[in-house]
Amino acid sequence: MSRILVVDDNKDILQIVEIILKNYGFEVMVTPNGEETFAKTDSFNPELILMDVFLSEGLDGRVICKNLKSNPQTKNIPIIMFSAQTKMDDAFHICQADDFIAKPFEVVDLISKIKQHLSNGTASAITSVN
């Protein structure tokens, strides 16, 4: 079972994404606070991080991403950034994120991106929802 950490300051989005990912067989941890991301990354050891670009509390998603990518212990964790702003190519490249998806997103698109980034052989099989 692949572990995914979801970071978003919108608790409704956190709850929806958590339910979706659990239905697809992922082990999920969520946090609404950017500053908690580092501690949860250490304790949960996620195989992928799904994170909002703009967080209202604590550190911004771009700052967190850049810090995680510059840390030798976390630099290889794929990070998919998401935002309601669709013109985010520059922002996610600057912070060295691995991918970007615009909100609102289709479940099939989200799962496809997750599968793509977990397909390096370290992730367990992803099951589909019936």
Per-region residue spans from a language model:
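Charged docking surfaces used in two-component/phosphorelay signaling
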Residues: 15-23
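Short hydrophobic/Thr-rich beta-strand motif most characteristic of the beta2 strand and flanking loop
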Residues: 25-33, 40
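Short amphipathic alpha-helix used as the core "switch/output" element in two-component signaling
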Residues: 39, 62-75
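His-Asp phosphorelay/catalytic-motif detector in bacterial-type signaling
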Residues: 45-47, 73-78
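Active-site residues of response regulator receiver
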Residues: 52-53
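Alpha4 helix (beta4-alpha4-beta5 surface) of REC/receiver domains from two-component response regulators
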Residues: 59-63, 85-102, 108, 112-115
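Hydrophobic/aromatic residues positioned on beta-strands within the core alpha/beta folds
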Residues: 80-82
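The C-terminal output helix
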Residues: 115-130
